[in-house]
From Swiss-Prot:
Catalyzes the deacetylation of 1D-myo-inositol 2-acetamido-2-deoxy-alpha-D-glucopyranoside (GlcNAc-Ins) in the mycothiol biosynthesis pathway. GO terms for molecular function: N-acetylglucosaminylinositol deacetylase activity; zinc ion binding. It catalyses: 1D-myo-inositol 2-acetamido-2-deoxy-alpha-D-glucopyranoside + H2O = 1D-myo-inositol 2-amino-2-deoxy-alpha-D-glucopyranoside + acetate. Pfam families: PIG-L. It is an enzyme of class 3 (hydrolase). Belongs to the MshB deacetylase family. SUPFAM superfamilies: LmbE-like. The gene is mshB. Gene3D superfamilies: LmbE-like (3.40.50.10320). It comes from Nocardioides sp. (strain ATCC BAA-499 / JS614). The keyword rRNA-binding does not apply. This is 1D-myo-inositol 2-acetamido-2-deoxy-alpha-D-glucopyranoside deacetylase. Its cofactor is Zn(2+). Coiled coil: none annotated. Zn(2+) binds at H13, D16, H155.
Length: 302
């Protein structure tokens, strides 16, 4: 099936898509727009939150990636998304892992696997995505900002690969064997609204929840994944699709627990916590704006 409007999302690990843009994906899929997800790794180094599955860990049986493949399939079914690929095919790039810096953001781990995405050759990885771009021909691309939200090396690498691939895909003389050139009209970085985050934190604290997003003060400095409202470009109101997003998050059971911070946010703040998804425009012209000066559709102006 050929869709008139086509969205491509590039994410690092299974579950990133559901947390970041799950509601938008469900909304656009339900509206009959094309939604394609490219996941760069299998998430092999993720923390396992299900005790009976800890044997799948990288330092034991090393089968978490295959298990998370099934979780992602289930999540896509919940979102109504039928076009999902792994960059270069499943198993091409491995989750790089990470560690926490004393300043509170992620940095590369001390010991990184030789096939880790962080070590990937940029042009080779980009070429895998160029082929997808030229096949799908999306008008809109969504990925991370240059810091990967919170510094995870795979998020940063996904940003680099997506950005480079988008540029290469538009060059008619570049790798003609990968398909006809395609210039993506608009590129967005996923974002989180500062005012919304502060309001959500305040609601959590007033409800007596001091553990969800521990260490984050609604009136204090916030981590780098939070974006000042003045730097936001678009908001997609997909509150009608929050249940699909939450169901997709539940499908990633090894990574997200229903008693964790994400669901605490939903329980205390309601659908608005997860149904409004924000973006920063990195390439392209802005379309029609709402009263807050934001686009309400990623395809606005196209």
């Amino acid at each position: 099936m050929t869709f008139d409007q086509r969205l491509l999302l590039v994410h690092a690990h299974p579950d990133d898509e559901s947390i970041g843009q799950g509601a938008t994906m469900a909304k656009y899929a339900a509206e009959g727009r094309g939604v394609t997800l490219v996941t760069c790794t299998g998430g092999e180094m993720g923390e396992i939150l299900v005790p009976e599955l800890t044997h799948l860990a990288a330092d034991q049986e090393d089968r978490l990636g295959e298990h998370r493949r099934g979780e992602l399939d289930a999540a896509m079914a919940e979102l109504g998304v039928t076009d999902h690929r792994y960059l270069g095919g499943f198993g091409t790039y491995r989750d790089s892992g990470m560690k926490w810096h004393e300043d509170g953001h992620a940095v590369p781990a001390d010991d990184i696997h030789q096939n880790a995405f962080w070590h990937a050759d940029l042009t080779e990885a980009a070429d895998h995505l160029v082929a997808v771009i030229r096949e799908v021909r999306p008008q809109v691309l969504v990925t991370y900002d240059q810091f990967g939200g919170y510094g995870h090396p795979d998020h940063i690498q996904a940003h680099r690969v997506a950005t480079y691939a988008a540029a290469l895909a538009a060059v008619p003389s570049y790798r003609k064997d990968l398909g006809a050139a395609w210039d993506i009209a608009k590129i967005y970085w996923g974002a989180m609204s500062e005012s919304r985050m502060r309001a959500a934190l305040r609601a959590l604290r007033e409800a007596g929840d001091t553990t969800a997003f521990e260490g984050m003060d609604p009136d204090g400095p916030l981590p780098p994944f939070v974006t000042a409202d003045e730097d936001l470009s678009a908001v997609v109101d997909a509150q009608e699709h929050v249940e699909a997003k939450l169901a997709a998050m539940r499908a990633h059971a090894t990574q997200i627990t229903t008693d964790g911070p994400f669901f605490a946010l939903s329980n205390n703040v309601g659908n608005v916590a997860w149904g409004l998804e924000f973006f920063r425009l990195a390439k392209g012209e802005r379309g029609e704006l709402n009263q807050d000066g934001l686009e309400t559709d990623l395809f606005a102006g196209l």
